[in-house]
């Protein structure tokens, strides 16, 4: 087995390990394995997308977006990262709408307390 195949094998091994850990919700272990996979092959799109998804699942949205954007740059066509990025962008606009409603509600409470 030549050197390149060994590196790809190692990358796939760590990706599969990260996938198993993500399936049982061991998110910290999944991050470690997926990062190791990317150390062997930084162009492992599946590992990069899964790492982004794990970050997103942990509430680290910015880190997830970074991984998906890198993935999108490495493989511009037919990449599931497009879906993840668009979902985050859509949820960000929904979050902003909710945030504005909360601000208005709080302002109404201030007005009520001033007249009471």
Predicted segments — roles?
Residues 1-13:
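TPR-adjacent "capping" and linker segments in tetratricopeptide-repeat scaffold/adaptor proteins
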Residues 5, 38-39, 70-73, 110:
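Conserved structural position within tetratricopeptide repeats
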Residues 23, 57, 90-94:
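Register position in tetratricopeptide repeats
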